[in-house]
């Protein structure tokens, strides 16, 4: 594996796409300081995955992108590509099969960094994996930059161990150990989290158990509280209805009293209206008299104002006449002055017009001469520009031909080198095995068919499993439902049986029965079976006889006369069977509704029930009671008894109430339990079958999935083998064809380049002669053009001066004309104003003659007499109005008193209405609450006892609420959460065990990796130490050196260098000179190379601190090691340059831009010498 070429674009100073070959084993890079040589080393380190900008001599990673120069803009991306010849297959991983490997990295300004391998997107990790164990990497010992030699020899022991590990090739072991430690760390963290969760879950389970108890108590309290609250609502609703009725009656009484008071008010209002009409009439008369007085006063005022106006008008007209005479004299004087100024202005305009005409003629003459001069100037300039363009074209042609010659030389050299490489590569190509490829394809087809079959079976199994799972869940749900149903029926049956048992064994009568040993006797009700619905009717008729005890002879009951039972008790003895009594008419007897198996018992019931008949309801019984025989009775389903002369309403008042109904229900429930048990057994059998089918399908799915995975893995493996061989065959065919075509193309290109170079030399000579002729002619034309340009400039200046003089003259003439027009307008205005003032003067004199005061004084005396008469009439009208106003005020006060008496009544009615409305709203509120709760009010009323008070119910609700509040926060989902938490704890316990096993497995793997790494490192240390001891004397001409381990454990111990040149006994290497340190570091690096030679090595001015003798020894050692390792070195030393097989020159002719140039070996040596 060797480096064959490097491509750079936009990386640091290599802004243009640059591609240079690395053909030999010793390639030197030369050039002046600062031209960008070290950027090549940075580029290689960068593309191998370097992520620290400081290692690339920058502050941020964007610094590797070209940042612009004085003539170029900054670049937007940087790209570096390394092309390796992998014909020996040394590359690691899947890329080892490729003969050529191209590693590429691209970085853009937005920070996006991309890696590619053979133009396929890859990760940074993938690129590093290729070079694991080869000594290559962003900071490996195979890339030695400026100052790195000193850092190696002066590195800390722990840092120096890193180079030893790279030489040993344990990078992959360390990577595996790091990944294993990461997984171990993650597993331990997961185990810790699981254990924390388990502990937390255990505490949570205890809380949930306590919460479940509280939730059950909470439900009981809530149910009791809801019942008490609804009873309270119903009681409040009834009280609100009663209060509403009381308030309605009070409102009616108050309304009657209000109507009486209102009638009195209407009488007072009628009297008030009569007085108000009279008052309106008197008020109108008074207002008429006052209006007449106002008119008389107005006439007096008008005449007085008229007299005052006449006097003021006479004075005003006299003043106006005097002012108009003065204005008339002023306008006449202004017209005379303007006429004199007009004559002077006309003379000035004539002079200005004459001067303007002369100046315009001079300016026109100068402008007419300019076009000819300008045309000559433009012709001369065009000719001069054409000459300049031809010179520039000729110079460009010369440069182009020179570049063509250099390019042709470079192309010829590169083509010849590539021709030789292609010949060598063609001879080393190996044809792939066709038979093996065909065999792999047949195996692949066979396994793909097997995979398709397995995938089909897997799809069928995956499709069937959800269906079976649904069937299984449905079966289990049915089992649960049937079990719940049977449990419910059994619980109901047990409750009824217990109730029946309690009825028999509890109460006042039982101790008496036990005392007389009668407790074992059968009760009557156990032998009776009544038609459904008539149980209560039979109980109402038989009453205490329903629990009668059967005895063989009634005579011995006489013994209980002295020791009577504490409650009613009946005995019966079955007589001889008799015929039942016939029912009169259409009456239905009760006895046929009772099913009795015992004939003797039937005779007893015939005696007790012979005259008892049934009716559907109480109304029917009452209607037909006269049809009853003597001593007969009707009984209805509700238990009410109707005789010919009375009605007995039934109520449960004994312990035996409802025993027949309960017995009937017990019998029905017993049958239902047996039927439900059969259904439950059937559901359990179906669930077992469904569970077995699901388990079988699940196992089959697991087996089919495993088969499909094995088939998939085998198919993938065969696909990779086929792909490798196919790609190898394609690469062989493609590369063979490509080499043949390239060789033909290169031969043609070589001939073409030679012909182009000869043609370029001829063109260069021709263009050189043309350039000399053009430059001579250009100098002559340049002088003639400068003279013409000066003449044209002077002519333009003189024309501009003449034009300015003409412009000034025209402006003076226009000013004179404007002055004349203005004076004419002033004269016309003065005449017009004088005429207008004369007309106004005539009008004012005529107005003065029309003014007369005597007529106005006579009219004023008459108006004063009329006003006095109007004042007397107004006084009489005002006296009449004041009298009516006093009467109207008295009547209005009476009306107000009546209205004030009405207001308390209205307030009382309003208050009563508010109370009635409040009662109605309260009732509606409680009715709405009952409706919202969907309460059956009829059933609720039966629970409402007469002695229940709202305070009692409110106290009960408060007590229950306090009990609920005392429970604190209640988790209603505690029961469900408890089941879920228990199930989760079982799962977490299993997961904790799995994680513990995984930790043990990972720890075993780490111990195995450490064991292998320790052995490999020890062997490497011994081997490097041996090579180091051999190479050090070769570079120094004697002396000794060795490596020392600073610790007992090689995995974490440091490495220290001990070096003593000939004749020195120094204790540490820090006492050596700079050159000695450099040689020591070089010996150490090359010792690592001999152990694990890297494909190539980059040296950046490593020989800088060495003198000529040491440089010679260094060069000899590098030359000897180049048999196994390719060296690319940067140097300014002539001795180092001489050992190179090829030289690559780096130049910076354009500031800030690096380019690659061909370098002659002798020129380079002379450059280094200078």
From Swiss-Prot:
Sections of the chain in a coiled coil: 169-215, 245-365, 401-508, 664-944, 983-1020
GO cellular component, one term: chromosome
InterPro entries reported for this sequence: P-loop_NTPase (IPR027417), RecF/RecN/SMC_N (IPR003395), SMC (IPR024704), SMC_hinge (IPR010935), SMC_hinge_sf (IPR036277), SMC_prok (IPR011890)
Keyword DNA-binding: yes
Domain SMC hinge residues, every copy: 520-623
Annotated binding of ATP, by residue: 32-39
Single GO term (MF): DNA binding
Residues that span the membrane, as ranges: none
CDD domains, per the entry: ABC_SMC_barmotin
Keywords, in A-Z order: ATP-binding, Coiled coil, Cytoplasm, DNA-binding, Nucleotide-binding
Superkingdom of the organism of origin: Bacteria
Gene3D superfamilies: 1.20.1060.20, 3.30.70.1620, P-loop containing nucleotide triphosphate hydrolases
Assembly with partners or alone: Homodimer.
Biological function: Required for chromosome condensation and partitioning.
Family designation: Belongs to the SMC family.
Designated name of the protein: Chromosome partition protein Smc
UniProt organism field: Burkholderia pseudomallei (strain 1710b)
């Amino acid at each position: 594996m060797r480096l064959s070429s490097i491509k750079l674009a936009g990386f640091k100073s290599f802004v243009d796409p640059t591609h240079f070959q690395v053909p030999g084993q010793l390639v030197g890079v030369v050039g002046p300081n600062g031209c960008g040589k070290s950027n090549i080393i940075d580029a290689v380190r960068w593309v191998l995955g370097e992520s620290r900008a400081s290692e690339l001599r920058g502050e941020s990673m964007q610094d590797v992108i070209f940042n612009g120069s004085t003539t170029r803009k900054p670049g937007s991306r940087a790209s570096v590509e390394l092309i390796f010849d992998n014909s020996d297959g040394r590359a690691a991983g899947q890329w080892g099969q490729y003969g050529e490997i191209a590693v590429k990295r691209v970085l853009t300004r937005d920070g996006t960094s991309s890696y590619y391998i053979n133009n396929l997107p890859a990760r940074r990790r993938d690129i590093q994996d290729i070079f694991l164990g080869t000594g290559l990497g962003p900071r490996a010992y195979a890339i030695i930059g400026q100052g790195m030699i000193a850092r190696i020899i002066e590195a800390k022991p722990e840092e120096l161990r890193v180079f030893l590990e790279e030489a040993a090739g344990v990078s992959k072991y360390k990577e595996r150990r790091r990944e294993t430690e990461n997984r171990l760390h993650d597993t331990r963290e997961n185990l810790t989290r699981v254990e924390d969760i388990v502990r937390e879950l255990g505490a949570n389970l205890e809380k949930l158990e306590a919460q479940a108890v509280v939730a059950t108590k909470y439900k009981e309290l809530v149910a009791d509280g809801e019942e008490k609250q609804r009873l309270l609502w119903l009681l409040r609703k009834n009280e609100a209805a009663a209060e509403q009725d009381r308030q309605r009656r009070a409102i009616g009484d108050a309304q009657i009293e209000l109507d009486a008071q209102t009638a009195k008010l209407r009488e007072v209002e009628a009297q008030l209206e009569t007085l108000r009409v009279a008052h309106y009439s008197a008020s109108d008369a008074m207002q008429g008299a006052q209006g007449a007085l106002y008119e008389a006063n107005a006439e007096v005022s008008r005449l007085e104002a008229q007299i005052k106006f006449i006097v003021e008008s006479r004075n005003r007209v006299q003043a106006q006449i005097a002012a108009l005479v003065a204005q008339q004299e002023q306008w006449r004087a202004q017209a005379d002055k303007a006429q004199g100024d007009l004559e002077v202005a006309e003379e000035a305009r004539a002079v200005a017009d004459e001067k303007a005409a002369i100046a315009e003629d001079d300016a026109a003459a100068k402008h007419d001469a300019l076009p000819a001069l300008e045309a000559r100037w433009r012709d001369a300039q065009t000719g001069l520009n054409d000459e300049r363009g031809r010179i520039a074209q000729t110079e460009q042609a010369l440069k182009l031909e020179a570049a063509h010659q250099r390019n042709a030389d470079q192309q010829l050299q590169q083509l010849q080198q590539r021709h030789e490489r292609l010949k060598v590569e063609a001879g080393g190509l190996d044809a792939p095995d066709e038979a093996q490829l065909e065999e792999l394809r047949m195996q692949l087809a066979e396994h793909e068919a097997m995979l398709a079959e397995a995938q089909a079976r897997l799809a069928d199994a995956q499709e069937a499993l959800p269906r079976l799972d649904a069937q299984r869940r449905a079966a289990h749900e049915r089992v649960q439902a049937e079990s719940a149903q049977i449990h419910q029926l059994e619980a109901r049956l047990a409750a009824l049986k217990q109730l029946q048992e309690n009825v028999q064994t509890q109460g006042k009568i039982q101790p008496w029965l036990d005392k007389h040993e009668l407790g074992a006797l059968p009760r009557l009700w156990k032998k009776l079976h009544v038609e459904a619905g008539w149980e209560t009717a039979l109980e109402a008729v038989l009453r205490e006889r329903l629990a009668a005890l059967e005895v063989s002879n009634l005579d011995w009951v006489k013994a209980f006369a002295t020791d009577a039972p504490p409650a009613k008790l009946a005995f019966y003895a079955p007589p001889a069977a008799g015929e039942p009594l016939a029912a009169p008419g259409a009456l239905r007897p009760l006895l046929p509704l009772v099913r009795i198996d015992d004939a003797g018992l039937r005779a007893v019931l015939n005696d007790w029930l012979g005259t008892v008949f049934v009716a559907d309801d109480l109304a029917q019984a009452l209607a037909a009671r006269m049809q009853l025989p003597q001593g007969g009775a009707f009984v209805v389903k509700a238990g009410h008894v109707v005789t010919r002369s009375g009605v007995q309403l039934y109520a449960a008042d004994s312990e035996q109430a409802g025993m027949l109904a309960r017995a009937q229900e017990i019998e029905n429930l017993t049958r239902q339990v047996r039927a439900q048990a059969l259904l439950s057994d059937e559901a359990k059998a179906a669930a077992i079958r469904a569970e077995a089918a699901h388990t079988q399908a699940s196992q089959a799915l697991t087996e089919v999935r495993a088969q499909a995975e094995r088939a998939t893995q085998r198919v993938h493996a065969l696909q990779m083998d086929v792909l490798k061989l196919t790609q190898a065959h394609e690469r062989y065919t493609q590369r063979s064809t490509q080499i043949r075509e390239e060789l033909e193309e290169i031969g043609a290109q070589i001939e073409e380049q030679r012909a182009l170079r000869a043609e370029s030399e001829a063109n260069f000579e021709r263009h050189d002669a043309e350039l000399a002729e053009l430059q001579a002619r250009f100098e002559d034309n340049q002088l003639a053009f400068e003279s013409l340009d000066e003449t044209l400039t002077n002519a333009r200046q003189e024309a501009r001066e003449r034009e300015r003089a003409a412009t000034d003259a025209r402006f003076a003439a226009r000013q004179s004309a404007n002055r004349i027009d203005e004076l004419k307008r002033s004269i016309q205005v003065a005449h017009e104003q004088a005429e207008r003032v004369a007309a106004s003067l005539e009008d004012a004199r005529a107005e003065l003659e029309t003014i007369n005061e005597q007529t106005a004084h006579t009219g004023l005396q008459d108006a004063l007499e009329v006003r006095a008469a109007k004042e007397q009439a107004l006084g009489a009208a005002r006296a009449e109005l004041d009298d009516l106003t006093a009467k109207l005020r008295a009547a209005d006060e009476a009306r107000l008193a009546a209205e004030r008496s009405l207001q308390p009544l209205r307030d009382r009615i309003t208050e009563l209405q508010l109370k009635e409305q409040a009662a109605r709203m309260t009732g509606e509120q409680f009715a709405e609450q009952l409706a919202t709760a969907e309460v059956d009010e009829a059933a609720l009323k039966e629970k409402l006892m007469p002695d229940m008070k709202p305070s009692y119910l409110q106290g009960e609700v408060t007590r229950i609420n306090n009990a609920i509040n005392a429970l604190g926060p209640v988790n209603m989902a505690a029961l469900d959460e408890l089941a879920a938490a228990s199930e989760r704890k079982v799962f977490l316990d299993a997961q904790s065990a799995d994680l513990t096993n995984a930790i043990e497995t990972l720890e075993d793997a780490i111990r195995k990796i450490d064991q292998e790494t320790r052995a490999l490192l020890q062997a490497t240390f011994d081997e490097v130490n041996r090579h180091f001891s051999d190479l050090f004397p070769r570079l120094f001409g004697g002396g000794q050196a060795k490596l020392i381990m600073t610790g007992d454990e090689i995995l974490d111990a440091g490495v220290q260098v001990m070096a003593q040149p000939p004749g020195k006994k120094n204790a540490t290497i820090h006492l050596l000179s700079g050159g000695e340190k450099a040689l020591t570091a070089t010996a150490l690096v090359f010792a690592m190379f001999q152990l694990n030679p890297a494909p190539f090595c980059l040296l950046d001015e490593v020989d800088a601190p060495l003198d000529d003798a040491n440089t010679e020894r260094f060069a000899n050692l590098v030359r000897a090691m180049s048999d196994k390792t390719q060296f690319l070195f940067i140097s300014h030393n002539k001795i180092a340059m001489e050992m190179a097989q090829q030289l690559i020159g780096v130049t910076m002719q354009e500031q800030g831009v690096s380019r690659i140039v061909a370098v002659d070996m002798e020129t380079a040596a002379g450059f280094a010498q200078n």
